[in-house]
Curated annotation (Swiss-Prot):
Protein name: Protein 1.4
Domain of life: Viruses
Chief location: host cell
Taxonomic classification: Viruses, Duplodnaviria, Heunggongvirae, Uroviricota, Caudoviricetes
Topology class, membrane: Single-pass membrane protein
Pfam families per record: DUF5464 (PF17552)
GO cellular component: host cell membrane; membrane
InterPro entries from the UniProt entry: DUF5464 (IPR035180)
Compartments reported by the entry: Host membrane
Signal peptide extent: 1-23
Keyword presence, Transmembrane: yes
Record's keyword terms, sorted: Host membrane, Membrane, Signal, Transmembrane, Transmembrane helix
Transmembrane region(s): 28-48
Amino acid sequence: MFKKVGKFLAALAAILTLAYILAVYPQVALVVVGACYLAAVCACVWSIVNW
């Protein structure tokens, strides 16, 4: 129960932080989002390859 709440709060904090960065530093946020997207795509491809 507490682990789920902790994960939810961590995700919420990450989203709020990202939103704040997006509002204050748009260029930096775009780079960060692009890097995260690239990492997610790589992880998906890696999991498919190693299925």
